[in-house]
Amino acid sequence: MKPNITILKPNPTITEMFQYCNAPLKNTRWSWGAVSVNNDIFLRVWENELAVIEEKRFYRVTHLAVYKDKMSHPGIRERLDHVERICSGSPSFMIKCRAKNPKAIPREFKYFDVSHIGVGGKLIDIEGDKWLEQKNIINLKNN
């Protein structure tokens, strides 16, 4: 289940990273994830939106309270589609991102971890939002 990812330069942009995953973003401004040519789902997740439950790591993949009045936003609609695909069995992967200010809404992107991606596991519900288990990590430095 390891995706075929080849990093072509040492410090790619987040847009290039999705391209390297064979999952180009639909829109570089509002897309938070993408579907690969193999129907794998690649999602941006924020490194600080982590819940550890029974020694398992879960990252928030929906934040509906923030978007309750903006459900027509193309980014949230696309994210909900990605979550539905994961619920239906599509393999999923997470690109962990850091915000300049983790408390700001909307957040400004600072950087992402180009050396690893998380392998998604089960989705759980925490207070109305979906959180995706990170069941493994793929080291991209050796690809």
Model regions and ranges:
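Short helix-coil boundary/hinge micro-motifs
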Residues: M1-N142
